[in-house]
Structures are given as structure tokens and as C-alpha cells.
Amino acid sequence: MKKLLIIILFLFPSNSLAVEKNTTFTHEIFKKAQAENKIIVINSWNEFCLTCKKQIKILDQAKDKFKDIIFLSYEQTENKAIADILSIDYWTTIVIYKGKTEAYRSMGVTKKKDLYLAIEEVLKDKV
């Protein structure tokens, strides 16, 4: 049994599960986008979170579809100050702002249609 476990660990190294993403959130970008009344999608993630990995893949695709939207992300564990400012307590949280107003918040959503629908609903209300 011990040998089997060792073989499995070598076949599936833990870094293959890691999220490959950089923090793109900065206060300057966020405040400027708010001042310009832009729609901003913020995603909180963690390096070894599989749900986060699914969300990142969907949001990366959304960037191509929704060109006028600002997409920002940050690694939750290393950026507690950002999490505190945005009142985000958990990985997998996605928040959508319309200017300075929070228009949508979810946690753990991994269905593309649900995330796209949320973005489209905020776009419909665009002033």
C-alpha cells in the first residue's frame, strides 16, 4: 500500500493542481475603473483551489467576450489587505461592481452560463 501511494504521488505531482495566475488587482486600477463607472469583475483565488481553477478558466474566456469589462483577480492568502477592503472572506468569491456599486457577489460558482448570465445582467443595467 505504501509503495502504491508513493507511485501515485510521483505520477500526480501537487504542482499540477496549482492555479497558474497572477494577482492583477491594484487599488489604482480598481479606483480608476470605479471613477469611470466601468463594470469590474473581481475574483479571489488560492493556488491549490480546484474550484478557483475552474473559475479562472471561465473568467479568462469571459475577457475575450466582454471586452469593455475590467477583470481583476488576486490570490486570497497572500493579499489579505485586498480581501479586507472588498469584504471577501473566502476563495472562490466573485464580485461584480458597476462603478462604485456592488452589483453581484457569489461564492463557488463554476458554471460558465451562470457567470456569463451575472455579467450580462449587470451590463443590461448599465447607465
How should these model regions be labeled?
Residues 86-95:
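Structural micro-motif
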Residues 51-65:
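Typically the conserved alpha-helix immediately C-terminal to a functionally engaged Cys/Sec
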Residues 4-13:
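Sec-dependent N-terminal signal peptides
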Residues 44, 49-52, 94:
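The canonical Cys-X-X-Cys-His
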Residues 17-37, 121-127:
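N-terminal leader/targeting and pre-domain segments
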Residues 35-47:
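Short active-site neighborhood of thiol/selenol oxidoreductases, capturing the structured segment around
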Residues 44, 67-80:
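Thiol-based oxidoreductase modules, predominantly thioredoxin-like and allied folds used
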Residues 98-127:
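Non-catalytic, surface beta->alpha helical segment in thiol-disulfide oxidoreductase systems
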